[in-house]
């Protein structure tokens, strides 16, 4: 595998039709066939598209975009989004994200930086339980990674959709988007609820939901089960190992 990577073989891209456009997957990524792409996070994609269905001219912020699968799946399924702003700090994934964003049928930008509640720098580290590049998390401070906030983009007063998959930095992303969220005509946010990440950070995802409620009223639903979530108890149940996605929609 290392020899193939050194020779650039794994940078070869397999192009798949997705809706009216083409989506590219590099060979070095986990093996993915067309059916895997079409059914990627199907419960999350279905609920997210349902929640944004009444939006017009929406802006989608994709935080932790990897190669752009989520944004592309949404744009293939929904006409609610007119602009995508995607972020991926991993230098291996970013060139493929940039190419996939350029192929979307809507205005789209890709930024090779992390998203948090400050503008500055940091570095990516891997947790002991997962060495995959998609599990790396941001450590603020001196480092090669640029960091920005959603509020920096000043998309105030618009219909806003946000996907956050940043391995434990969800609260920081939300704090850095508070003005955007508070001023939005409507807002839909997807947050990953990962038991191992919560164990590392000591923060149950309910804290993110409580923060959103402090800004404005939201409805919270688990994409995989359809369960409505209350903020009077932890999101993650004792002994839970399955990763869930919480879709938060303004009431």
Where are these regions (language model features)?
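A conserved beta-strand/loop capping segment in the N-terminal third of enzymes
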Residues: 15, 116, 123-126
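Active-site/binding-pocket entry motifs
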Residues: 27-29, 128-132
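Active-site beta-loop-alpha junctions enriched in small/polar residues
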Residues: 194-196, 225
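Conserved beta-strand signature within the Rossmann-like core of class I S-adenosyl-L-methionine
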Residues: 185-194
């Amino acid at each position: 595998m290392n020899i193939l990577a050194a020779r650039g073989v794994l940078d070869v891209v397999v192009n798949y039709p997705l809706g009216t456009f083409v989506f590219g997957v590099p060979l070095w990524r986990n093996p993915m066939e067309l059916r895997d792409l079409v059914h990627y996070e199907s419960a999350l994609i279905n609920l997210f598209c349902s929640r944004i269905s009444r939006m017009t001219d929406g802006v989608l912020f994709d935080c932790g975009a990897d190669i752009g699968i989520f944004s592309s799946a949404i744009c293939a399924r929904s006409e609610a989004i007119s602009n995508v702003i995607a972020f991926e700090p991993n230098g291996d994934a970013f060139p493929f994200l940039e190419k996939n964003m350029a192929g979307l049928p809507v205005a789209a930008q890709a930024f090779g930086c992390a998203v948090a509640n400050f503008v500055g720098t940091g570095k990516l580290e891997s947790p002991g339980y997962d060495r995959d590049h998609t599990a790396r998390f941001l450590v603020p401070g001196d480092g090669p990674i640029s960091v920005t906030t959603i509020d920096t983009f000043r998309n105030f007063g618009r219909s806003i959709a946000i996907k956050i998959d940043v391995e434990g930095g969800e609260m920081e992303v939300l704090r850095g988007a508070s003005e955007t969220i508070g001023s939005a005509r409507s807002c839909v946010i997807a947050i990953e609820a990962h038991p191992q990440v919560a164990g590392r950070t000591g923060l149950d995802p309910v804290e993110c939901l409580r923060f959103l409620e402090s800004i404005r009223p939201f409805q919270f639903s688990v994409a995989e089960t359809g369960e409505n979530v209350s903020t009077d108890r932890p999101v993650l149940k004792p002994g839970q190992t399955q990763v869930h996605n919480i879709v938060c929609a303004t009431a």
